């Protein structure tokens, strides 16, 4: 009986095909079910990272009650505008389909940079929703960001769809009517100590080879002497005369939409001077609006739009407000 060696394949096929995301604004396909009537997500901009000392409040941790060095990510959260209500129903195949949209009257003029707005005489009104109340299965709102309030070099807003949580359709509709045409802040959606999921597009790495893209083992010996060590030894058999889709090949790496679960909100503030490092964040600048401090890292480069979604599978409900003793604001310029 020979030696049994377990050597799993290099790289994961879970995210194939590894191609570029269609757009930098993430698309959310899953939403958590909850009883509270509120927005379930909020868009923010990634500013950069720093570190902090936080008192460990997990009683099961060996460091309970002690100050712990923690990497943090700072995200700028300018207010968002609720520009439309979108309601969904079921079609003959039992799929969710859009029934109608109700747009606000006081739309921001910057929104015309992004989409062609419907004419006022063609717009549906809030009264039209009452006739569809029996067919409505889901209630969501269209919101747009305000990058002009930040130090980002753009004015064109991003538009995304956010679901309103809750069990009762009528309560969700009333809440949507209440916030239509208004500005919402991060404090209207999340609170300190809450767990959120971060959804965004990762850093783009361009065209990369098999070793970096899939983690293929570098070949040594005669292969290295021939200068062909960084490749796959065999891409398939003689028969069938084809290359399987699962063979590691060079191609696009990065700029994929990814979701990271259960990031804890350590702090929500409105004074950017207390969190901005000396000289500003690299490739971003200074914080001018509300901000969110998350524990750990977040996908994507600086300036990338990240959507904070209410945790869809939280480990445990940690709603304690963390005790932060120190946040580093030293210069990130390397001086």
Swiss-Prot record:
Domain of life of the source: Archaea
Which PROSITE patterns does the UniProt entry name for this protein? RIBOSOMAL_L3
Arranged from A to Z, the UniProt key words for this protein are: Ribonucleoprotein, Ribosomal protein, RNA-binding, rRNA-binding
Q: A single GO molecular function, which one?
A: rRNA binding
- An example Gene Ontology CC term for this record: cytosolic large ribosomal subunit
- Cited InterPro entries: L3_arc_euk, Ribosomal_L3_dom_3_arc_sf, Ribosomal_uL3, Ribosomal_uL3_arc, Ribosomal_uL3_CS, Transl_B-barrel_sf
What pairs make up the disulfide bonds?
Answer: none
Give the record's GO biological process terms: translation
**What role is this protein assigned?**
One of the primary rRNA binding proteins, it binds directly near the 3'-end of the 23S rRNA, where it nucleates assembly of the 50S subunit.
How does it associate, per the subunit comment? Part of the 50S ribosomal subunit. Forms a cluster with proteins L14 and L24e.
**What is the protein's given name?**
Large ribosomal subunit protein uL3
Native organism:
Methanocaldococcus jannaschii (strain ATCC 43067 / DSM 2661 / JAL-1 / JCM 10045 / NBRC 100440) (Methanococcus jannaschii)
